[in-house]
Amino acid sequence: MVHCAGCERPILDRFLLNVLDRAWHVKCVQCCECKCNLTEKCFSREGKLYCKNDFFRRFGTKCAGCAQGISPSDLVRRARSKVFHLNCFTCMMCNKQLSTGEELYIIDENKFVCKEDYLNNNNAAKENSFISVTGSDPSLSPESQDPLQDDAKDSESANVSDKEAGINENDDQNLGAKRRGPRTTIKAKQLETLKAAFAATPKPTRHIREQLAQETGLNMRVIQVWFQNRRSKERRMKQLSALGARRHAFFRSPRRMRPLVDRLEPGELIPNGPFAFYGDYQSEYYGPGSNYDFFPQGPPSSQAQTPVDLPFVPSSVPAGTPLGAMDHPIPGHHPSSDAQRFTDIMSHPPGDSPSPEPNLPGSMHSMSAEVFGQSPPFSSLSVNGGYGNHLSHPPEMNETAVW
């Protein structure tokens, strides 16, 4: 006797069905969900029989939008690795059904926003940022009691000015298609109250802000943002006024450049007269005063000295004359007296100063450092014809400047 796999009763009918290698009554082969008879094909799971629709609905791929099974006959859309019904693949803002190839933005892996709504919403959020506040910002929350924290956020929330917070009744007409965020309208009386409070206390505490909120009827966050913007505006005005004052002082009274020589005292970098800075030098061989005094007719009687008494070799170059070779005698100059003085200098004993070999034309005679110390700028004398007690003609003096 054959027993039915569904009802476990003996099969006495003329016909039977063989499903999953087991015998079934014809009336027992039915869907366990909808109780419909299965004649052509059936689906089995865990010993139970299902029709096609119920089987895919229960065990098939789930729709990521509605979490229901997807029938094989249903049209679906895929986004990333998820499958959606056509009715579930819509924009969450405008409920528009999205088509294949259309740009969209996915939120939370199972919600979609079309491109137009996303851009419009993003622009509106940026436009509303001047007055919108979040609870995560401690400087803008009503619970903030520290005025120093309020001042630290002045520059960040300085997007609202008194003009923006004033009365503006034509905002909706100027916005066009894009809707701007709501603006806080501050009336003239409320603005006067806030300005008076700002003049008294630029950084009000929470208690003062609560009193202002009760007096004006405005939100505490709006009052706090207004004070921050007002402080920022005052700082900007002070900076601009200080900059304008400095610029005005610079252009109105510029520094006048004076000549360099007029600002220097005599004896400084540029003294009176050429080469006068040598006059300040004193040593045991160079006395104070000018080293370039010249007397064409001989020194005055009061200043007449013999060459031996002179502390240095007199120079015949007047003050301010460029140094160079003196090849011609100066008019009015008596070479005999100068020759006599130079002869007396040259005629010292050999022990006092070394002498070059005699009778050598053009030989150089150097002054001894033991007698004259460090040689002055004109330390070499070239005399043609050697040295003698009397010079028959004016000596030609080649003077070499060493600087």
Swiss-Prot record:
It comes from the Eukaryota. Residues 131-147 have a biased composition (Polar residues). Exhibits a biphasic expression pattern. Initially localized to the Spemann organizer region of gastrulae, leading to expression in prechordal mesoderm and notochord. In the second phase, expressed in the lateral mesoderm and neural plate, eventually concentrating in the pronephros and the CNS. Expressed in the pronephros primordium by late gastrula (stage 12.5) and becomes restricted to the tips of the tubules and ducts as kidney development progresses. In the CNS, becomes progressively recognizable in anatomically distinct structures during larval development. Changing residue 292 to F: No effect on axis-inducing activity. Gene3D superfamilies: Cysteine Rich Protein (2.10.110.10), Homeodomain-like (1.10.10.60). Interacts with ldb1 via the tandem LIM domains. Both LIM domains are required for optimal binding and binding relieves the inhibitory effect of the LIM domains and activates lhx1. Binding to ldb1 also prevents degradation of ldb1 by rnf12. The stoichiometry of lhx1 and ldb1 is important for their function and an excess of ldb1 can inhibit lhx1 function. Interacts with the N-terminal region of rnf12 by a homeobox-dependent mechanism. The LIM domains exert a negative regulatory function and disruption of the LIM domains produces an activated form. In addition, two activation domains and a negative regulatory domain exist C-terminally to the homeobox. This is LIM/homeobox protein Lhx1. The gene is lhx1.
